[in-house]
Amino acid sequence: EHTELYFSSNDALDVIPRLPDLYDEPFADSSQIPTFLVSQMAKQHVTVALSGDGGDELFGGYNRYFWGKKIWNKLSWMPWSLRRLLGAFILSQPVERWDLLSNYACKLFSSAGVVQLGDKAHKLGARLETVHNIDDLYMSLISQWGKPQPVVNCNYTARTILDCREAWPNIDSDEERMMYLDSMTYLPDDILCKVDRAAMGVSLETRVPFLNHRVVEYAWQLPLSMKIKNGQGKWLLRQLLYKHVPKALIERPKQGFSIPLAEWLRGPLRDWAEALLNEQRLKQEGYFDPEPILYKWNEHLAGRGNWQHHLWSVLMFQAWLEKQNNKQ
């Protein structure tokens, strides 16, 4: 039985005040909102649910695994100084201008165009200015604020395996190195945390079959060609699904679990966000330098950039801090 849940920005606004208590830390993956709402819906029918988390990391499902190397192969021939100039030019053009270009090309060539071309162009422009190798590209793909020093008023930065490249395993395959690092960081620190705390917030237990140790061991024994083939991830899982599920339900673009956060921050969530990002408040609390944050906030409001993820990280810290201060 297939069930769909539709929710609005008002539903999100109802959930947001609960997030600091649900996560008990400044957790900043905006898909935490739909995760909580779908858990709430599932709890009406079951007490235990199965989750497919881990499938992407083990069987090569994320776009970065099969696009990362292609992007780097196209960029690596270009001298860094030229990449930097190209990146600066791309960033100098407003998001709306790139979107208009996409719409014009769509009409001119009778094609589908590129969805959110402006956002994608700005992300590419930022990476052109900073990446020197494929590992740099990977770090840029998984990071929001690339370096915390200009934003956070603190001399100490917590180090993880991502900051210690000398500790990275000697894996020849760029794709499998990304999969390993995601399995060690993104999966436990983001995905599993997000799902477990959102689900337990409504007393729904979740089980993760892909993370059975036998499945993990088996997946890492498989050659990469059984995971990524013809520019498509999770090849082996697809072959199994073809036996049980119509192909039309499988061969679709990866959708993720995102919400229209960029639009909502300019609209129904704006007042909530502006109260948390108040310049005097940021200065008084002393955790952040207001200048780079407010610069991105104003850029976002004006439509000159899509900084939803950068801003959400700060907003979730601010919301958590407000909750802690109110408890005292």
Report each predicted region and the residues it spans.
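Short acidic (Asp/Glu) and glycine-rich catalytic loops that position anionic groups and cofactors
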Residues: 65, 161-167, 194-200, 214-222, ...
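Basic, amphipathic alpha-helical recognition segments used for DNA target recognition
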Residues: 184
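Globin-like tetrapyrrole-binding proteins
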Residues: 187
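ATP-dependent adenylate-handling active sites, centered on carboxylate activation for C-N bond formation
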Residues: 1-154, 174, 198-244, 270, ...
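Glycine/proline-rich, flexible active-site/cofactor-binding loop segments
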Residues: 145-180
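PAPS-dependent sulfotransferase catalytic core
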Residues: 245-300, 304
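Short amphipathic alpha-helical segments and their helix-coil junctions
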Residues: 159-173, 220, 286-305, 324
